[in-house]
Amino acid sequence: MEKSPFPTEDMALTTILVVSEMSRAKDFYQDVLGAEIYREYGGDSCVIRFLGNWILLVTAGGPTDDKPDTQFVPPLNPENVSHSFTIRVKDCMGCYETLKERGADFLTPPVDWGAEIRAFFRDPDGHLFEISQA
C-alpha cells in the first residue's frame, strides 16, 4: 500500500457529537445556532455545516467492525466536560442576547475577564459551547 501525504489542504475535520434525540438536536443547531443541515442519514445521523466546519450529529450506538469495544453515548453528566467549542465573536454581549432570545441555555451572563469576555451555554444534550470576545 502506498503512503499518502497527510494532512493536505483538501481534507476537512468533522466533529462527531452524540445526541439523545435527533429532532431536538437538529432544531437546536438550526434554530439557535443558525447551522445548515447538509445531509441526513436515516434519522440516526445528520451532517450540519456551521461556520465553515462540519459537525456530524449521531444517536447512541454500540461497537462496529471499525470501532470495536467503543460505545457512542451522549454526555452522561454535562458538569464533567471532556471537550467544548469556542466561537470567537466581536460582540459577546450582543451575541449572548441573540442566542438567548433563540433559546440558548447559558450558564451565566457574559463575564468580563479583562482580556476576554465570555459566556458558556449547552446544547440540549449538554455539549458545552463558549462565545468569546478577545
What residue ranges belong to the model's regions?
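Vicinal oxygen chelate
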Residues: 1-14, 36-87, 94-122, 133-134
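Charged catalytic carboxylate motif
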Residues: 24, 91
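Short glycine-/small-residue motifs
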Residues: 128-131
